[in-house]
Amino acid sequence: GTITTVDNQQNGTRVSAPWIAIDAQGDSQAATLAPPEDLTKVGWYGRSAWFGQDKGSSVMTSHINYAGKASYGSIFITLRKGDPITITDSKGNVYHYVVENDPFYLNKSNQEEYKKQTQNTINKMNGENKLVLVTCGGAYVGGNLGYEDNVIVSAKLANNDKSGVKAGKDK
């Protein structure tokens, strides 16, 4: 299955994970990390790095559920270390990622600590490129927080063969 995400510069990006059947349109209009209300969409955070860049986090987000229905965030939380994720952009560039950690929870109640933690994961603009999937988790508390936690899954660019192609990226 695939997830399709649309970027203002590179329309038609497809994200696939062969171990699960998923298919959604993407949304990258917001400059804030807010999942699309449309459950058929997964959002790419427009201020994050593009997939396969030399550095920074490439961030995608989805609701875990919305209006009583499950969304793609409910799939994010099932990912496990070693699961493959492949991204193909509209130009045919293919990026291979491997999940590097089981999902972990960032509690949002202490905003100072939360901000520090997100700068090391979600908002990271240096270090090697990683794919970061973000959804909500924990108890629903309402208000500005919604859920008490964010659930984070990160994936690193996969090693490639010795063909000279940038690691994790096909020509």
Per-segment meaning from a language model:
Residues 1-171:
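Solvent-exposed, non-transmembrane regions of membrane-associated and secreted proteins
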